[in-house]
Amino acid sequence: ILTNEYLYAPFGDVANREGMILAKYLSGQDVSWRGALRSYASSFYEIRIAQTGLTLDEAKRHGYNADRLEMRAMTKNSDFEDSKPNKVEMIYDKDRKVLLGGTVTGHEAVAQFLDQIAIVINFEIPVEKFIEIDFAYSPTNSSVWNPLLVAYRKLIK
């Protein structure tokens, strides 16, 4: 999607989508698919990691005027004893103010945070529009500052 190059992405969800698209195409339906962002989530014992899109090096190599934004994202209101921090890294295009990639590492909710990043990358939603997204908030289930809203606060001045 971001590089217009073929991408090796041996993931089950990508294979399932490719199968559905092929079936629709073979049945005569008009279908298209722009490709995958290479989104994945994994874990090593209690540590979880999820990544999508381009790394900073990849973005620069493909000609983007890219930079990195790092932040901490709590899994719930930080007043709760069992709230855990996740590290979030977002790669963005400084010229167009759109996200190009993201990585989330931590103990909980990394795939959920990353799915939101993948959506805004896929649809090229500009950072300035993040303030318009109505994120769910509950002190026991999420932080009041979603990572996309933190990106908005840091990048739109």
Walk through the language-model features, giving the residues of each.
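A conserved FAD-binding loop/helix module that cradles the flavin
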Residues: I1-T55, N141-K157
